[in-house]
Amino acid sequence: MARVKRGVTAHAKHKKVLKAAKGFYGRRKNTIRTAKAAVDRSKQYAYRDRKVNKRNFRALWIQRINAAVREFGLTYGRFIDGLNKAGIEVDRKVLSDMAIHEPEAFGALVNAAKKALEYLKEAGTANEFEGAVK
C-alpha cells in the first residue's frame, strides 16, 4: 500500500482555521493551536448568542409596545389581554413596528383592545368579543 503524506490536507485545514481566526488578538490569529481553541469557543458563543439575541429583541419589542400603549392609558399586560379577548392575533414584532411607523393603525388596535376589555367587563363573561377584528 502506498504511503499517504498529509501535508496538503493539513495545510488546508490549518488555513481554514486561521482564516476563521482572522481579526483575533495576539497569538490567537496566527498560532494554529490557540487559533483552533479560539475558533471553537467563538462558535460556542455564536450558538449561545443567537438564542440570547431572540430574547433581547423580544424584550425590546415589549418595552416599545408598553411605552406606546401607556400613551393611551393602558399597560402592556392589559393591552395584550384585550387583543387576545378581541381575537386579534398580531405578534409583538409587528406591534412594535406599528407603534413606531404607523401610530394611527396602532391606535386603532389599542381602541379595539379597550373596547373588548370594556365589553367583557360589562358582560361579566370570559367569552370572546363578538365585534372582533379578524
UniProtKB/Swiss-Prot annotation:
Keyword rRNA-binding among record annotations: yes
GO MF annotation list: rRNA binding; structural constituent of ribosome
Listed Gene3D superfamilies: 6.10.160.10, Ribosomal protein L20
Coiled-coil zones: none
Membrane-spanning residues: none
Pfam family, one: Ribosomal_L20
Biological process terms in GO annotation: ribosomal large subunit assembly; translation
Gene Ontology CC terms: ribonucleoprotein complex; ribosome
InterPro entries cross-referenced by the UniProt entry: Ribosomal_bL20 (IPR005813), RIBOSOMAL_L20_CS (IPR049946), Ribosomal_protein_bL20_C (IPR035566)
Keywords, in A-Z order: Ribonucleoprotein, Ribosomal protein, RNA-binding, rRNA-binding
Origin: domain of life: Bacteria
CDD domains recorded: Ribosomal_L20
Keyword match rRNA-binding: yes
Protein family membership: Belongs to the bacterial ribosomal protein bL20 family.
Role summary: Binds directly to 23S ribosomal RNA and is necessary for the in vitro assembly process of the 50S ribosomal subunit. It is not involved in the protein synthesizing functions of that subunit.
HAMAP family named among the record's database cross-references: Ribosomal_bL20 (MF_00382)
Protein name, as recorded: Large ribosomal subunit protein bL20
Organism: Rhizobium leguminosarum bv. trifolii (strain WSM2304)
Phylogenetic classification of the source organism: Bacteria, Pseudomonadati, Pseudomonadota, Alphaproteobacteria, Hyphomicrobiales
Gene: rplT
